[in-house]
């Protein structure tokens, strides 16, 4: 399937399963924001910083693991535009699926933030409300937006690389729970990055709280960094580290009209290759 071919997008729109998948992404992302950001806004970071970081890291990591487990059979359990981008650039989903996944993920994030806003006390609403921002001290930035992009790209790379590894159907060594491995990737990334950027690694997660309280300072960082990390991780794993990675797979991904990322035979039929400049 050539992911930018209108035919593949129309085929998606005609399937009832596709619309179920959109609903699953909406619910999964809403729950992620409500639980993850809820753990952040109901904590007191100044009292015990280490306990705060651990609490929030566990909340996000375990929620991701739970929701991926719950909806992976319906939508793939992306609940993150950066994950969806990784699947787009490796031609595993169509363009319309990517765009609507992101739209429903972002809508779900705003809905989750709205539910959190409606169910918490006023002092929480006057605070940062789980928004992401660069680390500061005495009103001065400790890291620059460029450093923020780098941090977010790295931790999102860890997440998406793990997602692709757990979804590699041709690996014979996979054991244990894939959703748990993905949740652990989120957890360990939060342990590192909460003191630096608040840890986004998910543009939708950053968008929800920002919409509710109107906080947009450096918000673009939490789109650029995660999307960059997600795209690089998806391409690198699929083309270099997957069980069936090869130069032939890379070539077919680049030029074949009906590329199948999970095909057993990687030989390219030259009659169906349509090279693009």
Swiss-Prot record:
Its main location: membrane. Induction: Transcript abundance is high and expression levels are not significantly affected by desiccation or rehydratation. GO terms for molecular function: water channel activity. The chain crosses the membrane at residues 21-41, 56-76, 98-118, 145-165, 178-198, 221-241. It is a multi-pass membrane protein. It is found in: Cell membrane. A motif (NPA 2) lies at residues 202-204. One of its GO terms (cellular component) is plasma membrane. It holds the Pfam family MIP. SUPFAM superfamilies: Aquaporin-like (SSF81338). A motif (NPA 1) lies at residues 80-82. Disulfide bonds: none annotated. Keywords: Cell membrane, Membrane, Repeat, Stress response, Transmembrane, Transmembrane helix, Transport. It comes from the Eukaryota. Aquaporins contain two tandem repeats each containing three membrane-spanning domains and a pore-forming loop with the signature motif Asn-Pro-Ala (NPA). Belongs to the MIP/aquaporin (TC 1.A.8) family. Probable water-specific aquaporin that may modulate the water content and osmolytes during anhydrobiosis. PANTHER family: AQUAPORIN TRANSPORTER (PTHR19139), MIP17260P (PTHR19139:SF199). This is Aquaporin-5. The gene is AQP5.
């Amino acid at each position: 399937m050539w992911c930018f071919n209108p035919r593949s997008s129309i085929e998606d729109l005609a399937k009832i399963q596709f619309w179920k998948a959109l609903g699953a992404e909406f619910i999964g992302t809403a729950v992620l924001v409500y639980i993850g950001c809820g753990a952040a806004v109901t904590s007191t970071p100044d009292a015990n910083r280490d306990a705060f970081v651990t609490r929030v890291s566990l909340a996000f990591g375990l929620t991701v693991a739970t929701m991926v487990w719950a909806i992976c059979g319906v939508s793939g359990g992306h609940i993150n535009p950066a994950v969806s981008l990784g699947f787009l650039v490796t031609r595993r989903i169509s363009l319309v699926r990517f765009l609507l996944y992101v739209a429903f993920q972002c809508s779900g994030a705003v809905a989750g933030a709205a539910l959190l806003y409606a169910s918490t006390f006023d002092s929480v609403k006057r605070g940062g409300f789980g928004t992401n921002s660069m680390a500061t001290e005495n009103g001065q930035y400790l890291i620059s937006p460029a450093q923020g992009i780098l941090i977010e790209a790295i931790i999102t790379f860890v997440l998406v690389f793990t997602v692709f590894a757990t979804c590699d159907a041709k690996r014979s060594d996979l054991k244990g729970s894939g959703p748990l491995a993905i949740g652990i990737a989120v957890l360990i990334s939060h342990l590192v990055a909460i003191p630096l950027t608040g840890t986004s690694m998910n543009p939708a997660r950053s968008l929800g709280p920002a919409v509710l309280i109107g906080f947009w300072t450096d918000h673009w960082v939490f789109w650029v960094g995660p999307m960059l990390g997600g795209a690089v991780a998806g391409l690198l794993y699929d083309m270099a580290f997957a069980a069936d990675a090869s130069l032939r797979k890379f070539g077919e991904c680049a030029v074949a009209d009906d590329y199948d990322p999970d095909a057993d035979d990687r030989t390219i039929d030259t009659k169906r290759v349509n090279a693009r400049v």
